[in-house]
């Protein structure tokens, strides 16, 4: 579960390395985000020459969480880190590569471009 002030790794090559959650989108009093949910975040660490700079406010979608997600068949999927991919308003990633695995729930949430760029879908 990702909440306000949570720091996440960035799993793409948009130029950001780490982001800090500002707000979870989707409802007035929503506190937590899971895999496939969109957040508003601030870039805390960035690589030189990247598309996004430190201090930029961006939208990102959660692709991996330590808490994990429960599948309809009763199984759970958990990851070693909390990670997100920076996206544009039309749900396409700002980077051209995705690093690390992403959850199958991304396909159901409608992020086909992220799923197709990912090296592994679990």
Swiss-Prot record:
Pfam families in UniProt: Ribosomal_L14
One GO-annotated biological process of the protein: translation
Gene3D superfamilies assigned: Ribosomal protein L14 (2.40.150.20)
InterPro entries associated with the record: Ribosomal_uL14, Ribosomal_uL14_bac-type, Ribosomal_uL14_CS, Ribosomal_uL14_sf
GO cellular component: cytosolic large ribosomal subunit
Molecular function GO labels: large ribosomal subunit rRNA binding; structural constituent of ribosome
Claim: Ribosomal protein is one of the keywords in the record: yes
Keyword presence, Oxidoreductase: no
Keywords, in A-Z order: Ribonucleoprotein, Ribosomal protein, RNA-binding, rRNA-binding
Domain of life: Bacteria
Its biological purpose: Binds to 23S rRNA. Forms part of two intersubunit bridges in the 70S ribosome.
UniProt xrefs under PANTHER family: 50S/60S RIBOSOMAL PROTEIN L14/L23, LARGE RIBOSOMAL SUBUNIT PROTEIN UL14M
Similarity-based family: Belongs to the universal ribosomal protein uL14 family.
Self-association and partners: Part of the 50S ribosomal subunit. Forms a cluster with proteins L3 and L19. In the 70S ribosome, L14 and L19 interact and together make contacts with the 16S rRNA in bridges B5 and B8.
Protein name per UniProt: Large ribosomal subunit protein uL14
Annotated source species: Streptococcus uberis (strain ATCC BAA-854 / 0140J)
Species lineage: Bacteria, Bacillati, Bacillota, Bacilli, Lactobacillales
